[in-house]
Amino acid sequence: VYSIIRGVNGTLRAGSDQLYQWFPGEQGDGSGSVKEMRLAAALNGAFGDHLEDSGNVLAIPMTLVVSGEVIGPEKSALARRLPRASAHPVVFVHGLGLSEHSWNPRGEAGIGEYLDQELDVTPVYLRYNTGRHISTNGRELAELLGRLCANWPVPVESLTLVGHSMGGLVIRSACWYAEQAEAHWLESLKNVLCLGTPHHGSPLEKAGHVLDLALRRIPHANPMAVGRARSAGIKDLRYGNLLDEDWSEQDSGRFEPDARRLVPMLEGVNYYFAAATVGPNEKVLSGKLLGDLLVRLGSATGKHRDELRALHIDPQNCRVFFEKNHFDLLSDEAVH
């Protein structure tokens, strides 16, 4: 997925308008194979903002998925699809360029099924366009969760949100916008789990931005400006933008410092952070520099040199997994 995203350029972006012919069904109707959905998800991660702006059928709408079936948040749809729903829904939010299939990458039972068997919970998966701004997805998720909780087949006693990578940022954004709107579903929110979430950005996006700025200064290199073709969602990962204000006032043609608004964690909600490193411990240089190959430990655990930006989480709720990579957090039994 990430090799596709890093390699995208303007030519591929324009050509995406014709790719819909490869797919037998529209993305919003839940048709098509797992392979096709994974390809569409990768394309959305790469330039989903362009797909949406151009009205392309490949632009993935935000939907809920249960047992592989797209369902609406209406009371009748939820009751029909979830006749044995528990009072404890768990919503899984995938990361950049992925889909709900990322939670069981080998086609086997994943963390959602595991929790369903071991605990009295009902897993629900979010599918969304990861190329859009995180704040755009956050606002829409906040509204969708409101409808989900209001129309859940039984009264919701506890809501748990689980986000992998970008998914954790979308969750935190949704919580912010819901709090501003005094949304009722926040009363049910008890737990937020972030797996490999770049709370303070990803070094890969920072490097992509530097490359873009460098190419702009080289004569005749403009047509090769791969970095400029990055989607809005990818650009948000530079610092971990959560709000509209974090990106709307930024000049993409300049290197600007981190100017994000402070978004504290919600009071009364239990937060859990899981991070990974390819190193055998936190002191090894490879682990410090590479983290899980996409997100460094400090970012995934919420640490920051600026105490105002640091996310102070209970140490008992923060876990580091050694000799694991970014995607091991999705399927490794030790993480589950």
Could you tell me what each predicted segment is?
Residues 153-164:
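Alpha/beta-hydrolase fold nucleophile elbow
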Residues 1-126, 136, 151:
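Flexible, membrane-associating and regulatory peripheral segments of lipid-active enzymes
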Residues 132-151:
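Alpha/beta-hydrolase active-site loop
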Residues 162-176, 200:
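Glycine-rich nucleophile elbow surrounding the catalytic serine of serine-hydrolase chemistry
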Residues 32-36, 40, 48-51, 176-336:
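Helical cap/lid subdomain of alpha/beta-hydrolase-fold lipid enzymes
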Residues 91-95, 164-165, 196, 292:
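The conserved beta1-alpha1 loop
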Residues 67-80, 106, 144-149, 243-263:
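A Trp-anchored, charged/polar loop motif used as the substrate-binding/catalytic surface
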Residues 103-106, 136-139, 175-176, 206-207:
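Short coil/turn segments at secondary-structure boundaries
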